[in-house]
Amino acid sequence: VERKVLYLKPGAKATAGLIEAVSERGREGDLKSVVVASTNGKTAIKLGEALKDVAEVISVTEFTYSDDVKKSMKKLGIKAVEKADLPIQDRRGMREALMLFGAGVKASLEVASVAAEKGLVEGNVIAVAGTKGGLDTALVVKPSHPDDFNNPDPSKRMAVLEFLALPRQG
């Protein structure tokens, strides 16, 4: 299978292009869920609107969403995980290695792991995140529970299967 990887300039302007790439990949039908790191929920709502008939959206934040955002998410069928414990944040070596690819790569893998830990996903997912108020990273991931990050059995570990979009560094 031949795929193009988008290289997006970090920030809010990247969001539309990323959502289009995620929608296109989602329409292939083999992925049921998109997990997004969304601090205030606004980018999750944009994704939810675009993916309404394509895939379920799960939004993860370490904070709490406003009541208005929660209402909008509920209308779109978005599952919200608030006050999430971010499992990569406390693993310095892993965190710093992933940050070489950009904050969105770390955050994408982190929220995929949170969704797996909470039992919200089955099978492979699209994991989405970004920086500077926008979405610039999308990966197809085999998620795992945080306890399995270093599992000696590779079939139980998280794996990045595809890069759909990455932030252009520098």
Put a short name on every predicted segment.
Residues R3-V5, V54-L98:
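Long, charge-dense
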Residues E49-D53, K74-K75, V140-P146:
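Short, solvent-exposed amphipathic alpha-helical segments in soluble enzyme
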Residues A14-E20, A107-A112, A159:
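Active-site glycine-rich loop that binds ribose-phosphate moieties when present
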Residues I126-G170:
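Glycine-rich, aromatic-bearing surface loops/beta-hairpins
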Residues G77-K83, I88-D136:
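Long, charge-patterned amphipathic alpha-helical coiled-coil/hairpin "stalk" segments used as oligomerization
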Residues V34-A44, T61-Y65, V105, G130-L135:
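Gly/Ser/Thr-rich loops at beta-strand to alpha-helix junctions
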Residues V1-V35:
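Glycine-rich phosphate-binding "P-loop"
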